[in-house]
Design a protein with these regions (language model features):
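Nucleotide-sugar donor-binding/catalytic module of glycosyltransferases
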Residues: 1-129
Length: 129
């Protein structure tokens, strides 16, 4: 089973390494059949966000550039963030999609536990923090 973790980024260099490390180091004890991809949509970062992401050299990290913000200068920040997440989700190939902010840090068991709840319940959508 493939899961996609979608992350929208914009000038997140200050925090992104800690978050990416916490995602790539997820432990799967209940769901041993899981493969993971980290789908990143960057909205034109001008700091080192992309350089940091590229430095991993990890095939699980897929980076996409979101350029819609250039067409929609009138949109507020929350709308632009939503569009950036949508771009990541369009690229996702997983059976399940998890959303990640660029400045979060996840517990090592987060995805495993949430995936177990989703599989047991049979629900397609569930908000789990």
């Amino acid at each position: 089973m493939l899961i996609s973790i979608c992350m929208a980024t914009y000038n997140g260099a200050k925090y992104i390494r800690e978050q990416v490390d916490s995602i790539l180091n997820q432990e799967f004890t209940e769901n041993k059949d899981v493969e993971m991809e980290l789908v990143v949509s960057d909205d034109g970062s001008t700091d080192d966000t992309l350089k940091i992401l590229e430095s991993y050299g990890d095939s699980r990290i897929k980076i996409f550039h979101h350029t819609e913000h250039k067409k929609h200068k009138y949109l507020n920040a929350s709308r632009l963030c939503k569009c950036n997440f949508e771009n990541a989700m369009r690229q996702a190939k997983g059976d399940y999609i998890f959303l990640s902010d660029q400045d979060d840090v996840w517990y090592p068991w987060k995805v495993d536990k949430q995936l177990s709840v989703l599989r047991r319940s049979g629900e397609a959508v569930r908000k789990l923090n």
